[in-house]
Each structure stands twice: as structure tokens, then as C-alpha cells.
UniProtKB/Swiss-Prot annotation:
Name used for this protein in its record: Dephospho-CoA kinase
Organism this protein belongs to: Bacteroides thetaiotaomicron (strain ATCC 29148 / DSM 2079 / JCM 5827 / CCUG 10774 / NCTC 10582 / VPI-5482 / E50)
Pfam families: CoaE
Binding site for ATP: 12-17
Disulfide bonds: none
Gene3D superfamilies, per database record: P-loop containing nucleotide triphosphate hydrolases
Family per record: Belongs to the CoaE family.
Catalytic reaction(s) noted: 3'-dephospho-CoA + ATP = ADP + CoA + H(+)
Major localisation: cytoplasm
Intracellular or extracellular location(s): Cytoplasm
Top-rank taxon: Bacteria
Pathway terms, separated by semicolons: Cofactor biosynthesis; coenzyme A biosynthesis; CoA from (R)-pantothenate: step 5/5
């Protein structure tokens, strides 16, 4: 059975960079954000339950009405919880099918900014947190998203703190533009490949 690696971190930490490195090394990575958007369009359970929650107009001509869904989600914290309760279980099921479809592969990854918040931690064996200092993250996100510092800070403040993520992580990768990244990834993979008993499973 494949070892499942959860990759998480805050906005601008560089999760996608680590995921790409793993894929280059032959370890496929399930990008939960992309896959969640896909199955929201295609999964009958999600479509039915979102229609029940938000109304039939949440899908127009077969396409997700994103402005309406966003308006519903941001209208109340309870609304966001209800939408997540519809989508997240289906993402978990999709991830399990995806892993099965990979056959006898040694390792797979799951990238998710909300790995811990969404309960995806229970789907993986080990959690890797990608860490970068706050200022580095803010500058990266501003450049990437063409956004303002104020908006980026609001998004960061809405996320789980780095301290909490670190407490749940089995391994922390520092991506601060100074510490070499590849040796850290290689070290982590080597530990899992040869001596995975040195790390505590995320499920324990």
C-alpha cells in the first residue's frame, strides 16, 4: 500500500513548489483545490446538496454559479461549514479512488492548504508543512495574485496559524528563498523510504 504524504502550508509558503518536486521524483500528487473544483461540477451528490442548500440557481446551464455560492458562503460562518460538509467528504472519497487507481506505487501526495481544517489529515500517513516567514509569504502572494497587501493579510489571518500547523506536522520544510529546498525534500523522502519508523504517523 502506498505511503500517503499530506502537504500543507499557508498562502505563499510554496506548497506547489514542493508538490512539483515530488512529481519530478515520480511521486504523484493530488492537488485538492483543483480536484475539489472539478468534482463540484461533476459529482451528483455535491450538485444535489448544494442545490438544496443554496437554491437551484447555484448551477446555471450546468455550470457552478460561483458568485452566488461565494455570496452564500461569506454570508455566515455556518454557511461555510455547511458547504464544506458537502464538498470535503466527496474530496476524501475521490482521493481514495485516485490512490487506488495508482496501483502498486510506493508513495503519493495530497496537497491542501486546509489539510488539517478539512479533516484530510485522516486520509494521509504523514504531514509535511511547508514553512516560509510571513513577509516572504506576503510578497510572493502579492506577486502571484496581483493583490494588495491588505487583502493578502486578511486571507492569511483567516487561515490556521503556522504554529498550529507545525504542531500537527511530522516534517517541516523551510522554503524561505535562502535554505536549499531540494535537499530537504530528498531527506524527507529518504526517511520515509528507508526508515519511516523514525517518524510518527499523522494518524497516531
Amino acid at each position: 500500500m502506498a505511503i500517503k504524504i499530506g502537504i500543507t502550508g499557508g498562502i505563499g509558503s510554496g506548497k506547489s513548489v514542493v508538490s512539483r518536486l515530488l512529481e519530478i521524483m515520480g511521486i504523484p500528487v493530488y492537488i485538492s483545490d483543483i480536484e475539489a473544483k472539478r468534482i463540484t461540477h461533476t459529482n451528483d451528490v455535491i450538485r444535489r446538496e448544494l442545490c438544496a442548500l443554496v437554491g437551484q440557481d447555484v448551477f446555471l446551464n450546468g455550470e457552478l454559479n460561483r458568485p452566488l455560492l461565494a455570496s452564500y458562503i461569506f454570508g455566515s460562518p455556518e454557511h461555510a461549514k455547511k458547504v464544506n460538509a458537502v464538498i470535503h467528504p466527496q474530496v476524501k472519497e475521490d482521493f481514495r479512488r485516485w490512490v487506488k487507481g495508482k496501483g502498486d506505487i510506493a508513495m503519493v501526495g495530497m496537497e491542501s492548504a486546509i489539510l488539517l481544517e478539512a479533516g484530510f489529515k485522516q486520509e494521509v500517513d504523514f504531514v509535511v508543512m511547508v514553512y516560509a516567514p510571513l513577509e516572504v509569504r506576503v510578497e510572493r502572494a502579492i506577486r502571484r495574485d496581483y493583490s494588495s497587501r491588505e487583502l493578502i493579510m486578511k486571507r492569511i489571518e483567516a487561515q490556521m496559524s503556522d504554529e498550529v500547523k507545525r504542531n500537527h506536522a511530522d516534517f517541516v520544510i523551510v522554503n524561505d528563498d535562502e535554505t536549499p529546498l531540494i535537499p530537504q525534500v530528498l531527506k524527507f523522502i529518504s526517511l520515509l523510504s528507508k526508515n519511516n519508523h523514525y517518524l510518527c504517523s499523522a494518524k497516531k
